[in-house]
Amino acid sequence: GNFSFTTINLPKLALEAKGDLGKFWELYDYYIDLCHDYLLDRLKIIEEKHIYNYPFLMGQGVWLDSEKASPVDSIKEVLKHASYSIGFCGLAECLVALIGKHHGESEEAQKLGLEIVGHMRERTDAYTEAEHRNWSTFGTPAESTAGQFQRANKRVYGTIPGVTDRSYMTNSSHVPVYY
């Protein structure tokens, strides 16, 4: 199963970059690293828990190899089968903030959107290779997060047409429903 995931607010990075693609990529890499490190820190804490701390997940054999462990064993060995995901939200608004159009409106935006998602995938694939853990890129289905991120962006950057002018941003890589 998925151990945990965290989500990057893509429009925030685009707004911080102020249309500068070089700055956007720099911020994007920084936040991908931050998410990676956060998930590893969380793993260090959780893997010290025991099978008995998770009676349903571990006791019912839901996780691979949990059936081989005794109740007092650490869940560390079981967690080696888990996935660790870095997600994203608001690709459409990110693209509007960077180049003025989203991926449903122009080929240039679609190409850049694919590069943004592809870059995260390359980074998570590199983590998988280096650490022998199951890292993945996750298009976050984030109804509540999309609203929270949008409110935070609007509070900091104000109302920006196509970026912060709605009560929520798009989930993951969706084309806006209003388009």
Segment roles from a protein language model:
Residues 1-81, 97, 101-102, 106-179:
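Conserved catalytic cores of very large enzyme subunits
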Residues 86-95:
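Extended amphipathic alpha-helical segments enriched in small hydrophobics
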